[in-house]
């Protein structure tokens, strides 16, 4: 048997013995990685001594660096994420975002954590599908929310009614008539604002358009989204979830313009989310006029993806 064959054989036995240890408990993502052929094929030997009765293989420290990278990807950076709110951290790893290309074709999925890491966004060009809900009452006032202080990206900024992403699951992957995104919007309005599903029927959401943008939040986190812009006109009772929302308020067009003035002047520490700012600057007020005239369907353009990065 050649030295290379000996190395491969011993490497396989080493990894199998390692994984069979009853004391070893691995996160599912790590278990998949360590069982994979890529793990075994990346083993590098420092020295090989072959004889008829003896083979000694010393495995390089490459193992630990590969394992460390896998651990960070699967579980996050323990040191820098220590201050993350427990609820937000759980959602970061439980939620699987829908990865798309710039034409909004589904290409895969990944954790909310990875999809919001600027390092991954830049190195892997991760782009995920998202939605922004604009809910108006019968007086044509827009419901705004202030994101909670514990949000990982853009805490305490003012934004539109609800902003999130559809999950990688059957009911939220339906492309026809943006049904998957509308299902996700209904789910998140309950989760963030306590609005029951029956108060915001899926067929009442009007998809007006799509935009693609990228926005860093701080040195570590950010957004890179293909965002569906959904309007709905309903009178609802709001019961904000404090894990998601710090405050809410309804505004008319003049009140929103006054808020924008204060933000631009740096008054009261007010800030807007970057996606809300893009919608305000490019679409909102002309669409709002359609809301008041009852001609919202005339403003719909779901064929164009507005690239605003």
UniProtKB/Swiss-Prot annotation:
Its EC number(s): 5.3.3.2
GO BP, one annotated term: chlorophyll biosynthetic process
Cofactor requirement: Mg(2+)
GO cellular component: cytoplasm
Enzyme class: isomerase
GO molecular function term, any single one: isopentenyl-diphosphate delta-isomerase activity
Associated pathway: Isoprenoid biosynthesis; dimethylallyl diphosphate biosynthesis; dimethylallyl diphosphate from isopentenyl diphosphate: step 1/1; Porphyrin-containing compound metabolism; chlorophyll biosynthesis
Reactions the enzyme catalyzes: isopentenyl diphosphate = dimethylallyl diphosphate
TM region(s), chain numbering: none
Keywords: Chlorophyll biosynthesis, Isomerase, Isoprene biosynthesis, Magnesium, Metal-binding, Photosynthesis
Domain (Nudix hydrolase): residue spans on this chain: 126-278
Cofactor note: Binds 1 Mg(2+) ion per subunit.
List of residues binding substrate: 112, 147, 151, 164
Active site: 163, 225
Positions of Mg(2+) binding: 116, 128, 223, 225
Pfam entry (one): NUDIX
Function noted in UniProt: Catalyzes the 1,3-allylic rearrangement of the homoallylic substrate isopentenyl (IPP) to its highly electrophilic allylic isomer, dimethylallyl diphosphate (DMAPP).
Sequence similarity: Belongs to the IPP isomerase type 1 family.
Name of the protein in question: Isopentenyl-diphosphate Delta-isomerase II
Source taxonomy: Eukaryota, Viridiplantae, Streptophyta, Embryophyta, Tracheophyta
Encoding gene (name): IPI2
């Amino acid at each position: 048997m050649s030295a290379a064959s000996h190395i491969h054989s011993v490497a396989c036995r080493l990894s199998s013995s390692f994984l069979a240890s009853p004391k070893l408990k691995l996160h599912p993502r790590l278990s998949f990685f360590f069982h994979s052929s890529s793990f075994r094929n990346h083993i590098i030997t420092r020295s090989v001594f072959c004889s008829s009765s003896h083979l000694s293989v010393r495995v390089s420290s490459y193992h630990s660096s590969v394992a460390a990278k896998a651990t960070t990807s699967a579980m996050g950076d323990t040191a820098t994420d220590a201050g993350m709110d427990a609820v937000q951290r759980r959602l970061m790893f439980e939620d699987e975002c829908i990865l798309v290309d710039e034409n909004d074709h589904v290409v895969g999925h990944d954790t909310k954590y990875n999809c919001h890491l600027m390092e991954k966004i830049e190195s892997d060009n991760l782009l995920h599908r998202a939605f922004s809900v604009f809910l108006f009452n019968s007086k044509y006032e827009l419901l705004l929310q202030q994101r909670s202080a514990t949000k990982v990206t853009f805490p305490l900024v003012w934004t539109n009614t609800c902003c999130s992403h559809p999950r990688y699951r059957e009911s939220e992957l339906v492309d026809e008539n943006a049904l998957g995104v509308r299902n996700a919007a209904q789910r998140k309005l309950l989760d963030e604002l306590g609005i029951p599903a029956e108060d915001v029927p899926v067929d009442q959401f009007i998809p007006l358009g799509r935009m693609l943008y990228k926005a860093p939040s701080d040195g570590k986190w950010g957004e890179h989204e293909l965002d569906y812009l959904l309007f709905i006109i309903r009178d609802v009772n709001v019961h904000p979830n404090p894990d998601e929302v710090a405050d809410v308020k309804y505004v008319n067009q003049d009140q929103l313009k006054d808020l924008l003035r204060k933000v631009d002047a740096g008054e009261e520490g007010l800030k807007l989310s970057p996606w809300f700012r893009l919608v305000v600057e490019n679409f909102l007020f002309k669409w709002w006029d359609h809301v008041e005239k009852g001609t919202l369907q005339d403003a719909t353009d779901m064929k164009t993806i507005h690239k605003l990065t």
